[in-house]
Swiss-Prot record:
One of its GO terms (biological process) is N-acetylneuraminate catabolic process. It comes from Lactiplantibacillus plantarum (strain ATCC BAA-793 / NCIMB 8826 / WCFS1) (Lactobacillus plantarum). This is N-acetylneuraminate lyase. The gene is nanA. PROSITE patterns: DHDPS_1 (PS00665), DHDPS_2 (PS00666). Keywords: Carbohydrate metabolism, Cytoplasm, Lyase, Schiff base. Its EC number is 4.1.3.3. The keyword Cytoplasm applies. Pathway: Amino-sugar metabolism; N-acetylneuraminate degradation; D-fructose 6-phosphate from N-acetylneuraminate: step 1/5.
């Protein structure tokens, strides 16, 4: 089996009114552990719709995932927030629960300077004894860190790596070369194979809730030197991702999970609730890519 790490980005189940469905979250965790055999879960990130949750809701999600996982897999709590006080509170909460790793998205919207970004990470970590992955996703944050800036952030020994959700493969090569001992996890599911070629340590992704066995097979093929097989598997995954995006990816992920026997509930508004057309599209995706 591949030594590369496979993390699913944990989804958050909601009811129609946007209230958290704790049973749905537990079912998702169990599926990822028992069926998908993932190495870990990335909790309260973009896939978890965490930027639409209040502090107490984020704590509920973190607590429920931690309790259901019960030490079976690695867990990463995404605590980043524009509200630094909240980020610090969540970092302490997750650490006290027992999360072995934290992560934090770069602060966004206000065009913060790099010195302000560095201070943000150092403040989050100042009062907790834990490790952190920088969540770099410039397409959504507008924050594109450079190799030199990553080096400055890594001066804090608690910052151990990057969730690298960025299509800049030149930068990825430079960062991997400069920091061979840091944990770098690829965050774009559709770009996993080229990221593997640049020696990332593994991956974190939303579609791995559905597609983890195929992704594990791809990583195993890559590690075994069977690049043709790995490329064929990436082609299939990318066909699936194209279909998911065309059908509205976040609600469709949950609709396909329902076909797999897991009621992941609804997305949180202003995301769209399913239409009959969307449900039909999700059924077609399930039958094309997952039905045995």
């Amino acid at each position: 089996m591949s030594k590369k790490l496979l993390y699913a980005a944990q989804m958050t189940a909601f009811d129609k009114d946007g209230n958290i469905n704790l049973d749905g979250i537990r079912a998702l965790v169990r599926y990822n552990i028992d069926v998908n055999k993932v190495d870990g879960l990335y909790v309260c990130g973009s896939t978890g719709e965490a930027f639409m949750l209040n502090t107490d809701e984020k704590k509920q999600v973190m607590e429920t995932v931690y309790d259901e996982a019960n030490g079976a897999i690695d867990l990463v709590a995404q605590v980043g927030s524009l509200n630094l006080k909240e980020a610090k509170e969540l970092a302490k909460f997750a650490t006290d629960l027992g999360y072995p790793k934290l992560s934090a998205v770069t602060p966004f919207y206000y065009n913060f300077t790099f010195e302000q970004i560095k201070d943000y990470y150092n403040e989050i970590l100042k009062d907790v004894d834990n490790k952190l992955l920088i969540y770099s996703i410039p397409a959504l944050t507008g924050v594109a860190l450079t190799t030199d800036q990553f080096a400055e952030l890594f001066e804090n020994p608690k910052i151990i790596g990057i969730k690298y959700t960025n299509a800049d493969f030149y930068l990825l090569e430079r960062v991997r070369n400069a920091f061979p001992d840091k944990l770098i996890l690829s965050g774009f599911d559709e770009m996993l194979l080229p990221a593997l070629a640049l020696n990332v340590d593994g991956c974190i992704g939303s579609t791995y809730n559905l597609n983890a066995p195929r992704v594990r097979e791809e990583m195993d093929a890559f590690e075994a030197g069977d690049i043709d097989k790995a490329r064929q598997l990436q082609n299939i995954s990318n066909d699936m991702i194209t279909d998911l995006i065309a059908n509205d990816i976040y609600p469709t992920l949950k609709l396909v999970m329902k076909h797999m026997g897991v009621d992941a509930g609804y997305v949180k508004k202003p995301m769209s609730h399913p239409t009959p057309e969307m449900e039909a599209g999700a059924t077609a995706i399930y039958e094309k890519y997952f039905k045995n």
